[in-house]
């Protein structure tokens, strides 16, 4: 970048809106797993959509590439600048712009932390249902850019389903205002959907209008032992049928995952008296706690008679509920502390999850005998975090060196089931070079056409998702 371009960018954001200090920039150049490490000499921190727009206009004019970043919680390298690009942090775009209680909608800037948005909705007696382990750090812009899923997809859908409107800064600096709060709008192409899940490669999301829902008056949570993933799938069908659609979360947990959490997370304990090979964490929401508890207990008793359920425990307080959820939410952290691990974020039809787990696990163990399967996640929507920890006492570096080989084998099996190699984390750089193996030529051509049309100079997050 030449001196003139640097000066123009600094002038746009002012002295508080940029940093060239390596120690300040460094935390933004490495993601949580430490798998990807980047490089950038300049971090811009605009505090308005107009500043973002002006930054993009200058970068487009001078062919200066940049990488947008939210809370830096992404897991596939999509938010990391690898070639010295300008780092565009959206953390200062952190205002809740408006909450319309009657319309059940909320307008927020892209840098608002997910937990902050949830809290703002709760204060108005409403619910923003997107919920995931990184919600204390992840931002709305990042959630939108990756089309995040989380634990409530079963009832409320993925992030894409929770968006009414968007504001997007385009590569040439124009600001696209799609901030409609309408639930029905059939006036041409739904342009906002192009940018959701695009990982900042087509435009920079600066604000959004989000759907809100009535806050449930009651919630019941159960930790349930099941003999197999197949039993879990059948239990899900039974619970959905008997609950009338009140099941909001249904999470699969393997015994080894529970053991890792108890080993590495202070205060974690087994909720049940006897071990089981698998568990599910079930949550239902509705109007009356007593009715929810009674209905869930009756459904679990019926499932037990069918051999689908072993032991189970229902949370009797908010503290107990939080303790049960912490077992699921700390799974990734516990696996990280355990050592080297190879991870996959995949989805298959719910009915295919048991066979997928069996076949894919066998394929990995054939390649790496002794590898420890830690498969968990959102079985209610078919999204499994298909992870493996390195063999006990094995060489972690040697295990990680086989990531691409193992990933390819797993993704081939996913594809055979008509599944997706990225359920909710995105493509980034991790899966970019495999995407063409599982997408048709027509799909890839259309994706490249969109990229060339909206970003002809390839300044927006270059090298991510799709190459042009």
Each model region followed by its residue ranges:
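C-terminal substrate-recognition/cap domain of FAD-linked oxidoreductases
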Residues: 21-29, 224-225, 233-402, 406-409, ...
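FAD-binding subdomain of flavoenzyme oxidoreductases
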Residues: 95-251, 460
